[in-house]
């Protein structure tokens, strides 16, 4: 009985739904595990909501790929074998855990990128823009009129698709053999042309 009780209080990996994003600026979300533990007598025990769970997304200390997270999104929870309270508080070097707990529900991390199969982002019909499974794609606002994307084609081409496209910077350099403009060209300020001369914009 004691071993069974101890196992009941240990967690390893569970899907969950996001129930709170008020601490998203800190890289944490509130989640509710969605699969309970079924016992031989037919009863089920559902874990409680877990607050302030750190998000796992591609990042280093100085670079990151940042995704918006909303209530209703799904995540995959993994649970540390040791108490991560000190680590969450900023301890980056080797240290002793603050408690003796093992695989505890309070030591969860939330991995983004888990969805039911019927909500797969690989499904072309879920995309407003044309989609190929052979391409590498960064997409936002999936399936809406505001869908935009950066697409690395299997052919070696690159496509940017958006309602409006803006470069912000002090300079922009294009080292290409040819630039083809399929629409109107509006210049605000001065445009210097190779071969001499300035063209004044509006």
PLM-predicted stretches and their roles:
Residues 153-202:
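Intrinsic-disorder/coil detector with helix-boundary
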Residues 1-163, 168:
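Hydrophobic packing positions characteristic
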